[in-house]
């Protein structure tokens, strides 16, 4: 789930923290990728006539097709990916996982109704909602990555937290995921849409953690409390408090404890036994493997091994697999090239550019404040409605 409404809040109040780029602009970068998020995307998106790709026995192969060709695309663009797989979820995530299970049950019932009615569009919609990444999917992806010569890391707990640890240790440049909580874990850079298909023509969105804090005018601890207030995977949020109200409260009171002492609890309903302190601990000190002990190596692909793994029962086209393997080898041989900016120290922004950017941010904030003033007579419930 990530953090509810965080990307929009940053876009509104800290626009300078976001930069859109083409994938080729990340040439020479090492990037830690949330593997489970990728596999889910591939199972959803890589389809033929609305259905997942599968073997004659019905075993899905969409995740392998997506992993193989999207990884080749990254390497073709000079990016060195390392995939990070989820470990055991923290106990505090049990509530969120239970909610997901309930939504799956609802989707299964809706799918049955759609199937009985013969509604193809609804059938496809609810089939997509029932997609989940299994341990078998992950194990197959790991085997594929080994054969491709691409490193992966098994996180002891949350993949986003392990990605953030790799970034903070300087092992990689950024975390690539669609979950915004990578920023809450302190990833210096977050990349969204990096593993999207080329056909979607989505520019990569790069979020800079330092600029997020600067634009929102928060410390790292205050930012974590903001994310908890907005809604995270580890605990419920206070009913009636949406993103804009959450940041107003954090800026006024600076932490959740002081907010709880000052808000009207008849208007804002605090969850019973609200475990926000434990959620905060999970963001501040997540369970991760020490990045200094992780050795990342990109090696030559095993062409024959790839053919054996992907062709045959999985029915991949052998010629295409061998062509893919040759592309992998070519990218491996060209990895000696480095980014030009690694030789130079970055110059500070010019005063004119900095001033113009600051004016833009102030205009956005002023516009948001004007809207708030016009709607201040509305009910707290309306202001606290969660974005979809």
Swiss-Prot record:
DNA binds at residues 47, 70, 158, 231, 233. Its EC number is 3.1.-.-. The gene is Fen1. It comes from the Eukaryota. SMART domains: HhH2, XPGI, XPGN. PANTHER family: FLAP ENDONUCLEASE 1, FLAP ENDONUCLEASE FAMILY MEMBER. Its cofactor is Mg(2+). GO terms for molecular function: 5'-3' exonuclease activity; 5'-flap endonuclease activity; DNA binding; magnesium ion binding; manganese ion binding; RNA-DNA hybrid ribonuclease activity. It is an enzyme of class 3 (hydrolase). Interacts with PCNA. Three molecules of FEN1 bind to one PCNA trimer with each molecule binding to one PCNA monomer. PCNA stimulates the nuclease activity without altering cleavage specificity. Mg(2+) 2 binds at residues 179, 181, 233. Structure-specific nuclease with 5'-flap endonuclease and 5'-3' exonuclease activities involved in DNA replication and repair. During DNA replication, cleaves the 5'-overhanging flap structure that is generated by displacement synthesis when DNA polymerase encounters the 5'-end of a downstream Okazaki fragment. It enters the flap from the 5'-end and then tracks to cleave the flap base, leaving a nick for ligation. Also involved in the long patch base excision repair (LP-BER) pathway, by cleaving within the apurinic/apyrimidinic (AP) site-terminated flap. This is Flap endonuclease 1. Transmembrane segments: none annotated. Phosphorylated. Phosphorylation upon DNA damage induces relocalization to the nuclear plasma. GO terms for cellular component: mitochondrion; nucleolus; nucleoplasm. Keywords: DNA damage, DNA repair, DNA replication, Endonuclease, Exonuclease, Hydrolase, Magnesium, Metal-binding, Mitochondrion, Nuclease, Nucleus, Phosphoprotein. Belongs to the XPG/RAD2 endonuclease family. FEN1 subfamily. Residues 351-388 are annotated as: Disordered. Residues 336-344 are annotated as: Interaction with PCNA. Residues 1-104 are annotated as: N-domain. Its main location: nucleus. HAMAP family: Fen. Binds 2 magnesium ions per subunit. They probably participate in the reaction catalyzed by the enzyme. May bind an additional third magnesium ion after substrate binding. The lineage of its organism: Eukaryota, Metazoa, Ecdysozoa, Arthropoda, Hexapoda. It is found in: Nucleus, Nucleolus; Nucleus, Nucleoplasm; Mitochondrion. GO terms for biological process: base-excision repair; DNA replication, removal of RNA primer.
């Amino acid at each position: 789930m990530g953090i509810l409404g965080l990307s929009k809040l940053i876009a509104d109040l800290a626009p300078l923290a976001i930069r859109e780029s083409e994938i080729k602009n990340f040439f020479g970068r090492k990037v830690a990728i949330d593997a489970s998020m990728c596999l889910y995307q591939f199972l959803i998106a890589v389809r033929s006539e609305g259905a997942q790709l599968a073997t004659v026995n019905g075993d899905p192969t969409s995740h392998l097709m997506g992993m193989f060709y999207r990884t080749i695309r990254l390497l073709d663009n000079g990016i060195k990916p390392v995939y990070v797989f989820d470990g055991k979820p923290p106990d505090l995530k049990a509530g969120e996982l239970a909610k997901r299970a309930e939504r799956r049950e609802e989707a299964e019932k809706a799918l049955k109704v759609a199937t009985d009615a013969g509604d193809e569009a609804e059938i496809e919609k609810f089939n997509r909602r029932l997609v989940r990444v299994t341990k078998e999917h992950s194990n197959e992806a790991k085997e594929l990555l080994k054969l491709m010569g691409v490193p992966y890391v098994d996180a002891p707990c949350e993949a986003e937290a392990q990605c953030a640890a790799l970034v903070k240790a300087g092992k990689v440049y950024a975390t690539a995921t669609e979950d915004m909580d990578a920023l809450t874990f302190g990833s210096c850079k977050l990349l969204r849409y990096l593993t999207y298909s080329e056909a979607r023509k989505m520019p990569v969105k790069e979020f800079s953690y330092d600029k997020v804090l600067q634009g929102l005018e928060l410390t790292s601890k205050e930012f974590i409390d903001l994310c908890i207030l907005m809604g995270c995977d580890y605990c419920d949020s206070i009913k009636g408090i949406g993103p804009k109200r959450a940041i107003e409260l954090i800026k006024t009171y600076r932490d959740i404890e002081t907010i709880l002492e000052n808000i009207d609890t008849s208007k804002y309903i605090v969850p019973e036994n609200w475990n926000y302190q434990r959620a905060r601990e999970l963001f501040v000190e997540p369970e991760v493997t020490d990045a200094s002990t992780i050795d990342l190596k990109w090696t030559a692909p095993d062409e024959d091994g790839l053919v054996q793994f992907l062709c045959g029962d999985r029915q991949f086209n052998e010629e295409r697999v061998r062509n893919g393997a040759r592309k992998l080898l070519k990218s491996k041989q060209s990895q000696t090239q480095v980014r030009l900016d690694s030789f130079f120290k970055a110059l500070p922004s010019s005063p004119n550019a900095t001033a113009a950017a600051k004016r833009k941010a102030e205009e956005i904030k002023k516009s948001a404040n004007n809207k708030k003033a016009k709607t201040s007579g509305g009910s707290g419930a309306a202001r606290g409605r969660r974005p979809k």
